[in-house]
Amino acid sequence: MDKGDSELQGIGIGVGAVVFRGDEVLIIRRGKAPFAGQWSIPGGGLHEGERLEDAALREVREETAVEIRLIGLIGVFEALPTARDGEGYLRHTLMIDYAAEWLAGEPAAGDDAAAAAFVPYEEALRRVSSDLTRTAIADALKLRNTVTSGP
């Protein structure tokens, strides 16, 4: 095992949500390493014993002060380590992302978010830093349109 392999510290499980309010998407600017300053969707680590859906609701509330209703599962996204996390480790991460609708509250940055805002869909796609996040946003819109238009 080479030095790079020995620095890999397990697999992290994160849960996030693409939140819609009309034609807008809720995004946050990360406040902590390794992604400080980058725009993304609200999300974070799954706590031991926590249901995935509950984690998505909690993360959105903690990072943005917004209450949501989950529409459905978008998918599971895999991020191989390219940067050290806040603890200095290289971490392989699985993100489980949901589509959601806004219920109440105005975005206010909290927890590890430095900023939170609803922005138009196209602006959200431009602002977010990760191609995986852009894919999650696009997939969430497709799911939302399927759920709201029905068969």
Q: What are these language model-derived features?
A:
Residues 78-106:
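Active-site-adjacent beta-strand/loop module that shapes the phosphate/pyrophosphate-binding cleft
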Residues 1-16, 87-89:
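Acidic, metal-coordinating catalytic segment for phosphate/diphosphate chemistry
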Residues 19-20, 27, 100-102, 118:
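Conserved hydrophobic "DFG−1" position in protein kinase catalytic cores
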Residues 67-76:
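A short coil-to-beta-strand element that immediately follows conserved catalytic motifs
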Residues 24-62, 66:
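Conserved Nudix-box catalytic region and its N-terminal flanking loop in Nudix hydrolases
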Residues 97-99, 108-140:
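NUDIX/MutT-family hydrolases
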Residues 17, 73, 98-100:
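A structural signal for short, well-ordered beta-strand segments
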